[in-house]
Every structure is written in C-alpha cells, then in structure tokens.
Regions:
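Signature of extracytoplasmic/envelope-associated structural regions
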Residues: 1-224
Length: 224
C-alpha cells in the first residue's frame, strides 16, 4: 500500500499525517519446475500454444511464442486468480493476476528452478478451499537430464544457465474512486535473454559474439 504526504500550511511545527494510497499487488513465485505447473506459467507469459502436436502415449509437443496481440483490453496476457493459504484462518485471494516475468535456471546439484513475477488487480480474504495437487510426476526436472545444443550441435561447455523473459507489464492507476489499479498493460515489447557460465576452452563462441552471429540455443530436459 502506497503512502503519500499531505502538504499544507498550519500553525504547527510538525508535518501533517500521511494518507494511504494505491494498493499494489506484485510479487514473485519460485518453485521446482514440474511439467504441469510449468505449462501454466508458459501459458501465462506467452499465451496459448501456437501449435499442439500429439506424440502418442499421453505426450504432447507444445510450441509457445511471443504474443503478437494483447489477451484483451486492459489485460496483456490471460489473467489468473490465485489463492494463498498461510495457515491463518482464511485464505488470501488475488484476482486479475497476470504473469509478467518468467525465469528458468539450472546448474549441477539443483533441480530446474522456475520463478514468475506477477502483477494483480485486487485482493480479498475468502474461505479456504481444498486444492487438488498434481499426482504425477512426483519429482521435478533434474539437472542430470539436461542437455544443451548451440547452432544445432551438442555442447558440454555450459556449466549453468538462466533464461529470462520480461513482459514489461505494470499496473496503471487512474482516478476511478478506488485504490486498485485501473488496468494492466505493457510498457514495451517482451524481452527474452539468456545468461550463464561457459567453459572458456576455445574462441569459437567469443568470435561469434564479436561477429554478432545469431545461433539457435536449444535446452532439453527429460522427465519420465
């Protein structure tokens, strides 16, 4: 909750009391990357898959791409409703939540980690509901199932990596007789970047960097 000062002239030496302002709903969610929850996050950031292909045996190939249009007026991507129970009587419900940032990171001795930054419109206190948890698979993606290729060729030089997606989304306040944000919209294009640590064993990638050579970066994780 924002606070703002009251500025006026009065016969006192102290400043007047401040007042409560805009109620902002923002935060990050971090979790080990399981296939099904990860799918919700990908949809939340990129929208519905551009293509879905059945691979048989309950396996599917989903292709997500940077969106070319907003989900709706005042909602750049599909909104979600989140319920958070902190073991204190009731649950906190956050409505109109959109996923702004998305991060995947991996390194040895660590599962694939996912972090999502969210922006919401409103919050309320509701009765606790009973969630249904994913029953299979019971383990997240592990580092020892990860393989990486650059420009179509497998490489063992990558020691750690982080994939970042920034939707550049923010809540927009207005004079609408409420402390909630009026709408949520983009302030710029969706940005995708990759960072990490690479074994500097030769000058191949250094030369590609100097020449600004564009290459395909493919990350593969498998899960039974």
């Amino acid at each position: 909750i924002d606070r703002f000062d009251i500025k006026n002239i009065g016969a006192i030496y102290t400043e007047p009391d401040d007042m409560s302002g805009l109620r902002r709903i923002e935060g990050n969610i971090e979790f080990p990357a399981f296939p099904k929850p990860l799918g919700h996050c990908l949809r939340g950031v990129f929208g519905n898959p551009s293509s879905i292909t059945s691979l048989g045996s309950s396996l599917w190939n989903n292709v997500f791409k940077t969106p070319t249009a907003d989900f709706s007026a005042g909602q750049p991507v599909a909104p979600y409703t989140f319920e958070v129970f902190r073991d204190v009587t009731s649950s906190f419900q956050y409505a109109g939540v959109v996923m702004n940032t998305f991060q995947l990171s991996a390194q040895p001795n660590q599962e694939l980690r996912c972090s999502v930054g969210v922006v919401g419109k409103s919050t309320s206190v509701v009765n606790k509901t009973s969630p249904t948890f994913v029953s299979s698979p019971v383990e997240p993606f592990s580092f020892d199932t990860c393989s990486i290729s650059i420009a179509g060729g497998a490489t063992a030089l990558i020691e750690s990596f982080t994939l970042n997606v920034d939707g550049q989304i923010q809540g927009i306040p207005a004079l609408n007789a409420t402390t909630a944000v009026a709408k949520i919209r983009r302030t710029g294009p969706q940005l995708v970047s990759i960072s990490g640590t690479m074994d500097f064993s030769d000058l191949t990638e250094y030369s590609n960097f100097l020449n600004q050579t564009e290459q395909a970066f493919v990350l593969n994780f498998t899960k039974a």
